Structures are given as structure tokens and as C-alpha cells.
């Protein structure tokens, strides 16, 4: 076996599974403890376990994505993020203690962390390194065309209704609309307009990571199996740690929306770091595909799945954002339309997005 193959194969040894397994053992033995230092330690270990498996999910999805090529590659990664998010939300909802606003807060946080924070940092760092970066304008517009109405329908429109929320029938209809919109988008992305999501002059030569996106010595089935194993690990750790996390947040007097922020941060961390690196390698199109693909897939698929789970379990869901959150989210989506209106970006675009990200943090922690 060559050194290159051995290097790739070594990268895919599943030692990262040790952390979620260790977290599960600790949670089983001491998860009911109410002592604050123990609760903090348990939550830190659970966080390490969840992140370890989340990074592994994205790593295996990345190998499968490379074999499928664009735009299927970004689609695989986006769907992996959605599965992680639905798993986390469902596990927290299953405890019976999750707030009705958990899905709403998570969706809001994902939209703002991506469109404000990650896009802002990407454009700022990329602009400093390359001055001006280029992307396929028409592809970005397709994401925004689909994303804007979904965000408005799911998170803003309910406030205008008499009860300031969807009825059960309306919620199920919105779930159907969300899934249908994503189906239409997938048709555009994978069948009729694939070229819109690829920038032909993307600089692949600057990618100095010998492992990122490169074919593995293992089979696709091997990666698919381990991807599923790590997803199960994330679900198991989250479910067992739910009560301990609630104890910690109560002791910290954390704001209600902080749980949604935490879920969004956990699921976006692996893909976000990978996309930031892509921008620094002058692969901004790939990064934006990952960012906006994740947000679009999150709204389109999380809403139907979580709505059905809530309907079957009798849990209540609150959809409408408050006025400050609405203003910040709509402003961020409008800014995305402006920033990507020419197909060129620089540091000013990044600074503008980060300014709105700071406003988002005010709505969470103020």
C-alpha cells in the first residue's frame, strides 16, 4: 500500500467514537447528579462527545460528497447537518422539558449564525487575503430566492395571524410547503440547472489539505455505516444529557433562546470550519454552497419533521419571532441579496454581515 493511501486510511480510523462512548458511560453513572461542578463536568464531556461525532459525520459525508461531485457534494453535507439538527431537537423535545420555542429559536440562530457570522467572517478573511473574491452570482441567487419566502412564512408570517401562531392545520400546511419548496430547489440544483452552483474558475490548487475532500481507501458503504454510527452517537448523548443540560442552563439563568443558539452552534461547527477554510483557499463558491445550502435544507426539512413529531407527541410549537428578531433576520437576508448582487465580494461585505451578527447576539443575550 502506498504512503498516500496509508495516510488517507489513517485519517479515517474511528478513534473519535471514544468520546461519545465515554460520555454515555458517565451520563449513565452520574447523569442524575445535581451538584454544580459535576453537572458542568458532565456537560463539557457531553459537548466533546457530540462535537467529536458531529465532526466525524461531516468528515464521512465529505468523502461521499467528493465522490459524487458538485452540486451533489454540497447537498450531502447540507443534509448531514439537517439530520444532526433534527436529531438534537427531537432528543431535547422527547424529554418533555424543551420549550415550545426550541425549533423556532434554532432556525433563527442557524439563519443568523450563517448569514451574519459565518458569511461575515468568510468574506472578511477572504477579502483580506485575496482583496476581491468571485462566485457564480446566479447560483447564490437561487439559494436566496428559495430561502427568503421560507424564512418569512415560517418565522414572520405567524405573528400576523389572530393567535400569533399557526393552528395545527396551518402548521402542517407550512410543513408541506417547506418540503415542496426544497423538492423544487433540488430539481433545479441536481437536474436542470447544475451549472449555476459551480464556479468554473474556483482555485483548487490552493487547497493544501491532503485529506480534505480526497478519495478514501475505504468503500462508500464503509463511510455510510460510520456516518450512521456517529449520528446515533450524537442522538444518544444528546438525549441522555438533556436533563443535565437543563439543570446547567437553569443554574446559569441562561435566556430561553440560548438553547436554540447552542444547538445551532453545535451542528454548524464542523461544516462552518470547513467552509471557512475553503474561503481561505479561494474556493468561495463551495463555501457559499455549504452555508446557504445548510440554511435552506435546515428550514425546508426541519420544519416538516419536527412539526410531525410535535403533532404525534402532542407537543406545542411556537413559530413567530419577536419584533427585534424579525428586524435583524430580515435585514440579514436583505443584506445577502445586496452583498451577492454583483458576484464579487470584499472586506466591506464581511464587515456589514458581522455588524448584523452583533445585533443578533444582542437579541439572544440582551
Swiss-Prot record:
Residues 1-16, 59-74, 128-143, 189-216, 277-290, 340-345 are cytoplasmic. The chain crosses the membrane at residues 17-37, 38-58, 75-95, 107-127, 144-164, 168-188, 217-237, 256-276, 291-311, 319-339, 346-366. It is a multi-pass membrane protein. Residues 96-106, 165-167, 238-255, 312-318 are periplasmic. Its main location: membrane. It catalyses: Na(+)(in) + H(+)(out) = Na(+)(out) + H(+)(in); K(+)(in) + H(+)(out) = K(+)(out) + H(+)(in); Ca(2+)(in) + H(+)(out) = Ca(2+)(out) + H(+)(in). GO terms for molecular function: potassium:proton antiporter activity; sodium:proton antiporter activity. Sodium exporter that functions mainly at alkaline pH. Can also function as a potassium/proton and calcium/proton antiporter at alkaline pH. Does not play a major role in calcium export. The K(+)/H(+) antiporter activity may enable E.coli to adapt to K(+) salinity stress and to maintain K(+) homeostasis. GO terms for cellular component: plasma membrane. NCBIfam families: caca2, PRK10599.1. The gene is chaA. Belongs to the Ca(2+):cation antiporter (CaCA) (TC 2.A.19) family. It is found in: Cell inner membrane. This is Sodium-potassium/proton antiporter ChaA. Pronounced pH dependence with sodium as substrate. Ca(2+)/H(+) and Na(+)/H(+) antiporter activities are both inhibited by magnesium. Ca(2+)/H(+) activity is inhibited by the proton ionophore carbonyl cyanide m-chlorophenylhydrazone (CCCP). InterPro entries: Alkaline_pH_Ca-Antiporter (IPR052946), NaCa_Exmemb (IPR004837). Coiled coil: none annotated. One of its GO terms (biological process) is response to alkaline pH. Keywords: Antiport, Calcium, Cell inner membrane, Cell membrane, Ion transport, Membrane, Potassium, Sodium, Transmembrane, Transmembrane helix, Transport. Disulfide bonds: none annotated.
